């Protein structure tokens, strides 16, 4: 049977960065792997960030979001059936930061997937400087992604104080309590950034497995709180984009922005990758890009955001 891992994490937590390192670790062990990118929206930016992993022993597949729940589940199942015929040793699923974890477990219990795949590890990436106050919906997503983990990685741990790290762990356990989950996390948490993980750490993650936990479910779709907005072919410089994103993330009139990501060309015509969260905004060179900026958050106000990006 093919081992299949689920790597989750709330928006901007650093899932893709971790997956690049985890995938390299698996490749160095001689494994043949497939990575399935599953984005919340209709445009998949993270796929571009993983292209340098592609080779004879690593293939990338994608499921686009932007559809209803049942359609997305059907696409996920169909893609896993196709990937089950490719001879992989291991498949890594990277869903959006807004994801119903039950979909992963439910689909893998369907025939014929239950005979082809064996769940390996469930890993969640959490920002070590997690915001102390999140909405009920956001806390639910956090809890649902943490409830079944074998390992939790605290991203940006090297930037956080000891107090911030402990507050984040308390927040995780508080979120679990709010959804009536009996589990409390401690030993499963690696208090170090993905960049600091050693081969021994990855050995431990590979053996981490998962835990089947019960918790009270919330239908996020009914809340209609999470949005993703797409802005294509913006006529804006890289420096100006970074400045405007910083401003709009501080403007409550734009809604609750969790993350902004995308690509833009600099003055020399080279691609730059934008990645913005509540803690930092970065603009880094990248080989290939796509003229798109994606804004993800709760109760977003498109007209207000558009003023920052287009004027």
Q: Which ranges hold each PLM region?
A:
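Short, hydrophobic beta-strand segments that form beta-sheet elements in well-ordered domains
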Residues: 34-36, 261-264, 295
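Nucleotide-state-sensitive switch-loop elements of NTP-binding domains
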Residues: 2-13, 17-135, 140
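Short, glycine-/small-residue-rich phosphate/pyrophosphate-handling segment
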Residues: 140-141, 148
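C-terminal accessory "lid"/substrate-recognition subdomains
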Residues: 148-154, 159-287, 299-303, 310
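A short alpha->loop->secondary-structure connector
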Residues: 111-117, 142-144, 169-178
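Short, conserved catalytic or adaptor-binding loops enriched in Gly and charged residues
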Residues: 51-55, 145, 179-183
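Short, well-ordered beta-strand elements
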Residues: 291-297
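A short, charged/proline- and glycine-enriched loop
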Residues: 1-2, 289-291
